[in-house]
Amino acid sequence: MKVVFLDRDGTVIQDPLDERVDSLDKIELFPDSIEGLKYLADNDFGVVLITNQAGIAEGRLTEDQFWTIHNEVLTQLAPSGVTFLKTYMNGETGPNATEWRKPGPKMLLQAAEDLDLNLEEIYMVGDNQSDIDAGINAGCKGGILVKTARNKVVESPNAIYSAPNFLDAAQYIVANS
């Protein structure tokens, strides 16, 4: 099975100005993310969502609210025929965060175990250095930085590719797999 690990906020959906997607009205899909997800699906790639949700630890949303928002994202993607194989979420933040929070590798390692994946064949795609580092820490093929997020990193010395948007990242993945 060909799979891509993908961050959500700032990669698939726009980070709001206050930097947390903590309500349904803050969901804004990037148009190119839908195209990129379709492109991957058309080329027989499955997508596993790997997302940090610090808003839970900060008390800005509950885990139930996260899943309500996530289900709305899936509803908005459904007309395009796009879905995710599985979603892994970590709501920790700060000095007490465990290896489950990116850049820690635990969510990626768990996904590989659950879905019987070879990490050396998988790209981790995201808008933040922690996404790239999580892929490296888990032993993935490489990390791809998508330069779409507000107030985030625009270059990563550890990324094997920097893409202006997710569609470009998807095209790179298909061409290099």
Question: For the regions a protein language model found, what residue spans apply to each?
Answer:
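Substrate-recognition element of Asp-dependent hydrolases with the DxDx(T/V) motif
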Residues: 33, 37-70, 84-96, 135
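Active-site neighborhood of HAD-like aspartate-dependent phosphohydrolases
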Residues: 1-46
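Asp-based, Mg2+/Mn2+-dependent phosphohydrolase catalytic module
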Residues: 2-4, 8, 64, 68-83, ...
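Histidine-centered beta-alpha loop that forms part of the nucleotide-sugar donor binding/catalytic region
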Residues: 15, 52, 148-149
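Short acidic, glycine/proline-rich loop/turn micro-motifs
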Residues: 16-21, 59-60, 156-157
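Gly/Ser/Thr-rich beta-alpha loop segments that engage phosphate groups in nucleotides
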Residues: 12, 57, 61, 128
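Sparse recognition of residues in long alpha-helices and their boundaries
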Residues: 25-26, 49, 82, 151
